[in-house]
A protein has these predicted regions:
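Hydrophobic alpha-helical transmembrane signal-anchor segments
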Residues: 1-9
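Soluble non-transmembrane domains of integral membrane proteins
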Residues: 16, 20, 27-28, 32-37, ...
Length: 185
């Protein structure tokens, strides 16, 4: 009779080997993905009065889309190594919507300058290196190339961003983007 402890140890060993093999297969494709956004970031400057004089502080107001539609087409495939199988996927995303621009009163009482020309749109992607191609975003009928990395690591650890030219007289603007990401289960 085989001791129960030996069987449990063998099962744990095989489970560990399966997880390692699946990670190895996925490493050349892409990890599990989480996609967040887009987020519009608008920097602004405040001059705060104080006992020691005026302090000048730069802040960022973050705005989420008023409306957003996402169409995702997902294709999966299995890859095998030895007796182990990993499920890989490729997800094609089409994202569009509308951002309402904030009124100047949303920026705070002591705001002296809203830096509309330094606005940025970010999309958080767990592993942006798994993007299938260069990503563009169209904002108010103008096309911008999205750069690798988030504009501000405080909101996303990884992702893509584009600096966009905004006009303070706009009330809202449309956006759309399409990108494909590789990932694994």
């Amino acid at each position: 009779m085989i001791p129960n402890l030996l069987i449990q140890d063998l099962v744990r060993s095989r489970q560990s080997l399966e997880a390692e093999t699946q990670m190895e297969i996925a490493s050349g494709w892409g990890p599990r993905q989480k996609i967040i956004g887009p987020v519009l970031s608008i920097p602004y400057i405040e001059e705060l009065p104080g006992d020691d004089g005026t302090s000048i502080i730069q802040h960022v107001l973050r705005v989420l889309p008023k409306t957003m539609n996402i169409d995702i087409k997902l294709t999966t495939q299995e890859r095998q190594k030895s007796i182990y199988t990993a499920i890989l996927y490729q997800s094609a995303h089409e994202v569009n919507g509308v951002f309402d621009l904030p009124k100047p009163s949303r920026f705070g009482k002591y705001t002296t300058d809203i830096l509309w020309e330094n606005a940025v749109i970010d999309i958080g992607i767990s592993a942006a290196s798994s993007l299938d191609s260069v990503v563009y975003i169209e904002v108010a009928e103008q096309r911008y190339k999205m750069e690798s990395g988030p504009s501000d690591s405080q909101i996303f650890g990884s992702g893509i961003h584009a600096a966009i030219a905004m006009q303070p007289d706009q009330d809202s603007f449309t956006f759309n983007s399409a990108f494909t990401v590789n990932g694994s289960r």
